[in-house]
Amino acid sequence: QPKAAPTVNLFPPSSEELGTNKATLVCLISDFYPGAVTVTWKAGGTTVTQGVETTKPSKQSNNKYAASSYLALSASDWKSSSGFTCQVTHEGTIVEKTVTPSECA
């Protein structure tokens, strides 16, 4: 089976969640093969380790793999941030997606 680079999607917290003073960022990683990825979260240029949870890759129906990573923040941390980046490393290839709070006020 050929190598396949992951598709990465990064979603900001919902306004409903922000209303409860929580903010969870969701990084979805899909369609990669082989099934091993490293996920690094960054705030600005700083690596974030607190509040991070990454699932183990699971096989999709097309025999490629998918995984997701979550970053839990408080709403105030999210709103005062300059944005967060989900950096996915797969077979030496790096894919980055960034989300900023200004996108949905």
From Swiss-Prot:
Keyword Disulfide bond found: yes
InterPro entries recorded: Ig-like_dom, Ig-like_dom_sf, Ig-like_fold, Ig/MHC_CS, Ig_C1-set, MHC/Immunoglobulin
UniProt signal peptide: none
GO CC terms in record: IgG immunoglobulin complex
PROSITE patterns referenced in this protein's UniProt entry, alphabetically: IG_LIKE (PS50835), IG_MHC (PS00290)
Note from the entry: This chain was obtained from a mixture of normal immunoglobulins.
Recorded superkingdom: Eukaryota
Protein known as: Ig lambda chain C region
Pfam families: C1-set
Keywords: Disulfide bond, Immunoglobulin domain
GO molecular function annotation: antigen binding
Cystine pairs: 27-86
GO annotation terms (biological process): immunoglobulin mediated immune response
Residue ranges occupied by any Ig-like domain in the UniProt entry: 2-100
SMART domains: IGc1
Native species: Sus scrofa (Pig)
